[in-house]
């Protein structure tokens, strides 16, 4: 049974590979934030009276910046620890969330799109790289299965938060700014995972 296998793997991670578990919590939070921001950039553009053509242009701009950002972080990964670069990317997204509060024109929207692009592809690639380094090689298949489930579920929880804020009367800018919480807590859990030293019995 697929669900039994999934829950069995999650239980194994929670009891035997807590470093992996801490990272997965961090990953779930910050990648959910990434997905939510990307999904709602269009809504912010609409509020700023950006037409459909303009939205497509900004999306293409974001993807181009993301490609360049991935190349830059790829070079940096040869000199710095993966976790250090992950901290930079998460902090960058945290700043993007807060910047959303100041948006009032298309120039500001362009700056936000640039910020999203800078860290989007890099955060995803660095996360996968770090995960591959901390999991037991013999469990890579099933562990990456859980990782991919978390990745594909990106923006689920964040979308609920966005909807709740808007339902309470908040603007889309305020709603996006609340996603900073996801990155802040994700940063903390990544720090915990990075500093976690597994007791000997966890490796037996």
Task: Report residues per predicted region.
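Juxtamembrane intracellular "pre-TM" segments in multi-pass secondary transporters
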Residues: 1-24
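Short amphipathic helix-loop junctions that connect adjacent transmembrane helices
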Residues: 39-55
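Helix-to-loop junctions at the C-terminal end of transmembrane segments
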Residues: 68-82, 166
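Structural signature of the two symmetry-related core transmembrane helices
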Residues: 84-99
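Helix-loop junctions at membrane interfaces in 12-TM secondary transporters
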Residues: 101-112
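Intracellular juxtamembrane helix-capping segments at the cytosolic ends
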Residues: 122-135
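A membrane-interface helix-boundary motif in multi-pass transporters
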Residues: 164-183
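Multi-pass alpha-helical transporter architecture, strongest
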Residues: 177-204
């Amino acid at each position: 049974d697929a669900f039994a296998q999934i829950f069995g793997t999650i239980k194994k991670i929670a009891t035997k590979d807590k470093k992996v578990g801490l990272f997965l919590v961090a990953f779930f939070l910050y990648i959910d934030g990434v997905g939510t921001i990307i999904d709602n950039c269009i809504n912010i553009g609409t509020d700023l009276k950006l037409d459909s053509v303009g939205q497509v242009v900004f999306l293409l701009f974001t993807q181009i910046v993301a490609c360049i950002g991935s190349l830059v972080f790829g070079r940096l990964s040869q000199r710095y620890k993966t976790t250090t670069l992950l901290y930079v990317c998460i902090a960058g997204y945290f700043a993007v969330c807060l910047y959303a509060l100041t948006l009032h024109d298309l120039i500001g929207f362009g700056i936000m799109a640039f910020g999203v692009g800078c860290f989007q592809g890099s955060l995803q690639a660095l996360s996968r790289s770090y995960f591959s380094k901390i999991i037991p090689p013999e469990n890579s298949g099933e562990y990456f299965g859980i990782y991919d489930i978390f990745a594909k579920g990106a923006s689920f929880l964040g979308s609920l938060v966005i909807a709740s804020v808007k339902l309470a009367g908040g603007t889309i800018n305020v709603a996006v700014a609340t996603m900073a919480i996801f990155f802040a807590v994700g940063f903390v859990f990544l720090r915990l995972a990075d500093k976690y030293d597994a007791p000997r019995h966890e490796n037996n």
